[in-house]
Each structure stands twice: as C-alpha cells, then as structure tokens.
Amino acid sequence: MTASVGNIVLYILFLWIAPVFVGNAICNRLSMRGTIPRSFVMGYLSMWAVFQIITVPLILLKVSFLVDVVVYSMFLIGIIVYGIVKKTYRSMTIPKVEPSAWVGIIVMLATGIYMIVQSFRLQLTNADDTRFVVNAVDTVRTNRMLLTDVNTGKEILSWTGDLFKDVISPWAVFAAYLSKITGISAASMMHTFLPPVLLAVMMCIFWLIAGELFDKHIYRSLFVILLLVMYIYGYFSIYNAETFTIIRLWQGKATMAAVGIPALLYAFLRLYRLLPDDRRWKEKTVYNAEQKGAICMVWLTVFAVALLTSMSYILSTVMIGCFGFVYGIAKKSLRTAVMVWSACLVNIAYLGISTLLH
C-alpha cells in the first residue's frame, strides 16, 4: 500500500505536531517548562499512558477496535482543546542556547539525522517477532483487538500463548490506531513511518537527561553525540539495545530499550534534582507544585512504558525499587521513598490481570 500525499500530511500532523501540543498541555498541568523537546517527549509519554489505561479494559471486554479509536481520539482532541483554551502553547519555547554551543548542536542534529536515515534503511532487514505486525494489521482489517490466532488467522474466543502478554501491553493495537487515523497500512507504519518518530523521541530524551547532568549546552550536545555514535556503531550483536534500536524499533521491547528506560531515568533524575537535600529525618515532607508534578511524571512514565512490552513490568519495578531506596536515604524522607515505590502498584495491577487471565 503506497502512502498518498494526504496520508503523509496526516502522518506529520498526528505523529509529529499533535504530540507537541498534547505534551505542552501536560507540562502546564505538571508545572514543567514546556520547551519543544520536553513537550514532544511528554506528549508521547502521556499519549501512551492514556492509551494503555483506555485500551486494556476495552480489550478485556472484547470491544471492537472502532470504539477504542473513538474513545482515544476524544482524549487527544480534548487535551489539545484544553491547551488552546488555556493558551498553554504560549509557553512553548526553543531552549535558549549560548552562541558558542551552536556548532555542537548542529553536529548533534546532523548525527541524529544520519542515524535516522540509516535506521530507515535497516528497519526492513529483520523479521523477528513479526507477529506484532500481524496483530496490528489484523486489528485494522477485522476490527478485533487481539482476537485472532496469528498462526492460523482464525478468530479465537479466548487468549492463548503470547497474546496473554499483548493484552496487558497492547503496543500492536497502538500501531493499528496510528494506521487507522493516518490511512497508512499498519505494516508500513511499523516498519517505515514510526521508527523515525521514535528515534526523534529518544534523542529528545537524551537531550533532557543531558540537561539534568550539565549546565552548558556544549556539554549537553557532546553527551548526546557520544550516545548517538554508540548507537550507530553498536550493531555488533543481535541482542544489544543498539541493534534493537537501529533495525527493530517497531517492536515494543525495542522501544522500551530506546525510549522507555531513558524516559524513566529522566523522570527519576528530574525528581531527584527537585527534592531538597538539607532536610532532617524528623522534618515533615511537604511537596511544592513542581515536586508534585515530578512525582506524577514518574507515575505517568510507568503507565506509558507498560504499553510497550510486558518486560516493562519487571524492568520498571526494579528501577522504581532502586531509586526509591536511594531517594529515601539520600533525601532523608520515608514519604518520598513510599511515593516512588507506590508507582509499582501500576505493574502489580496489570500483572494481576495477566495472572487471572491464565
């Protein structure tokens, strides 16, 4: 299926522009500065989180895919309208950069574009776990969500095998949604059109992480360049994160490695920076609006990565446990540790659903 000019316009609108406005509105609610890179990242994290919250119950109820499309689209329209009414887009800015740092930023952007071009060429070279593509294509074709046996093509009444994992992490259904609203076939969406967007999100997250580590933009750009070079030349094994990112980013577990884990790391780093260092154990922990927003971002990110792969339930839980323990001691606040650990409730709930289905 060849994408028409209209399909490309919808692709740019829904996958490149709309997430920025959605993310900017979310940044406003979480007391975050809504720069374009941060808005782009927060847009996708919030879109994934809400899709996870909406879609899993609808899959369990065996509702048609069209209902999911309508309900989720209403959310997107609602959050964009909220941003327009509240005029949150006025806070959308490009980060101010020192003149001396522009050379590094230009090199960083050139490296990122080169990586996207190379990945664009390589995403069709690997067919492992193509059942994700089959699930997405079948969802669009039959209007059923994960109710087709990928081996036989026949409709099933209950889930079996790998579908147990997909029910609580319906990444293929999200790809099907993108296919539905843009008119681009699900296979083309996953292999060709979605990877460049995900790589752009990954690079923006790297930039945000660099912002938590370095004050000067030249150091931030060098940090991102180093990471991108490691990814570009890291294709020395079929099992490492670099390979999954370059040639298999259409898989949910690859997106978890490239986007999900860095997003969690950024959420934790930002929370750590915002929490005070000079408090005593006996002092009552009180959070301001920005700190509450940072805690909400941790929860939001945990919901978001839950959509990508069932592996996220283990990976994010380990990260939550470790960071919560460190924060509780370093910040001398048991409440902070509990607030971080409580994000595990998301994973416990979805794993409980999967267990009951078995």
Describe each model-derived feature in a short phrase.
Residues Y114-Y233, N240-W250, V259:
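Active-site lumenal/periplasmic loops and adjacent helix-entry segments of GT-C-fold
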Residues P99-A127, Y231, A343-T355:
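Transmembrane signal-anchor helices characteristic of membrane glycosylation enzymes that use polyprenol
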Residues S316-W341:
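Perimembrane helix-loop-helix junctions
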Residues L30-G34, T88-S100, R273-G293, M297:
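Membrane-interfacial, low-structure loops and terminal tails that flank and connect transmembrane helices
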Residues I59, K284-M311:
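Membrane-interface alpha helices of multi-pass inner-membrane proteins
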Residues P19, W250-R279:
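Specific aromatic-rich, kink-prone transmembrane helix
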Residues M1-V97, T336-V338, N347-L357:
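Membrane-embedded, hydrophobic transmembrane alpha-helices
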Residues I26, L30, P57, F206-D215, ...:
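Transmembrane-helix signature of membrane-embedded glycosylation machinery that interfaces
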